Design a protein with these regions (language model features):
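Glycine-rich phosphate-binding loop plus the immediately following alpha-helix
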Residues: 39, 122-163
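Conserved phosphate-binding/catalytic loops in two-lobed NTP-binding clefts
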Residues: 86, 234-259
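Phosphate/ATP-binding catalytic cores across multiple sugar-kinase/actin-like superfamilies
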Residues: 53, 192-214, 264, 268
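Adenine-nucleotide phosphate-binding core of ATP-dependent small-molecule kinases
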Residues: 175-207, 254
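Glycine-rich phosphate-binding/hydrolytic loop that grips phosphoryl groups
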Residues: 140-141, 248-283
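Short beta-strand-loop/turn "lid" adjacent to the catalytic site in phosphate-handling enzymes
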Residues: 34-40, 54-88, 115, 124
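Short glycine-rich, Thr/Ser-proximal phosphate-binding strand/loop in the N-terminal lobe
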Residues: 3-45, 49, 123-132
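Glycine-rich phosphate-binding loops at beta-strand->alpha-helix junctions
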Residues: 209-236, 250-254
Length: 283
């Protein structure tokens, strides 16, 4: 048996996972998962703290970890051995969490991506939003702050909206102006939030069409924890006659990138040892 660690460093949080494998890389098991908000702390300290918590929880030393892999802003992890692109990591993590999915929508703080994948997590096609677009978690946090609503509450609150008004779908600045106008017109907070979620979902459904999504789609990233956003995604998917998509989430969707990094770490470790991997044997 050997262990790997996957670390997904985002702009507002660090996700860390610890996985165990059989000697041939088979039967990967998720032993530890952690999400830590960065806030104004030193990112390297946040990363190191999460790593040490994982070791302590399972009675391991740093020398017991066969491979540490990162994704996201991995250059901030000075003890990593390897780094994997975000799409590669999220795709691998998604297949681990739900083998039925053939597409992934990764909704992060700064941008979102739609990926078409195969059963072995290979990314076949992808599209992504721009950093300034109104389809990101950071945009949603800005709106929540303006409305005086806790970020953890906006999803449930948006589900109460019964007459939503959608905002501008491309530019975050214009969308925020729309929200200010809605507040001045007396639109309820629930309807504003539901309209925002629907507008964000509409943009992402457009990305899904571009990559020719068909079948089960797993939402990963921070917005997977937002029930209002997930509901808006399914509503928009159901209303799009050009798309056949079933939106899914998993309790560990937010950790998909870190899980994928840990899984690829196991693959890389065996390759470096000159051993055949479970993945290569299945090919």
């Amino acid at each position: 048996m050997f262990h790997t660690v996957g670390i997904d460093v985002g702009c507002d949080s660090v996700k860390t996972t610890l996985m165990a494998f059989e000697d041939d890389g088979s039967q990967p098991r998720l032993l530890f998962k952690d999400l830590d908000k960065i806030r104004k702390r030193n990112i390297k300290h946040v990363v190191r703290s999460a790593f040490e918590r994982a070791l302590l929880r399972h009675g391991l030393d740093e020398a017991d970890i066969a491979y540490v892999a990162t994704t996201g802003e991995g250059e901030l992890v000075d003890f990593r051995r390897g780094h994997f692109f975000s799409m590669t990591a999220h795709a691998r993590g998604a297949i681990f969490l739900d083998p039925s999915v053939r597409a992934v929508v990764d909704c992060g703080a700064l941008h979102a991506k739609a990926m078409l994948i195969d059963e072995r997590s290979k990314v076949l096609a992808y599209r992504m939003t721009s950093q300034c677009a109104s389809g990101s978690g950071q945009f949603l946090e800005n709106i929540a702050r303006y409305l005086g609503v806790a970020i953890d509450d906006i999803g449930e609150l948006s589900l109460r909206g019964d007459s939503p008004e959608q905002v501008s779908g491309i530019c975050a600045v214009l969308a925020e102006t729309d929200v200010i106008n809605m507040v001045s017109r007396g639109i309820s907070t629930a309807n504003i939030l539901r309209g925002i979620h629907l507008s964000m979902a509409k943009r992402l459904i457009g990305l899904m069409r571009m990559v020719k999504t068909n079948g089960d789609v797993l939402v990963t990233g921070g917005l997977a924890r937002n029930p209002g956003f997930v509901a808006a995604m399914q509503e928009m998917a159901d209303n799009d006659k050009r798309l056949n998509a079933n939106i899914k989430i998993h309790p560990d969707s937010v950790h998909a990138g870190a899980i994928g990094a840990a899984l690829w770490a196991g693959y890389r470790h065996l390759r470096l040892q000159g051993q055949p991997t479970a993945q290569s044997q299945a090919a």
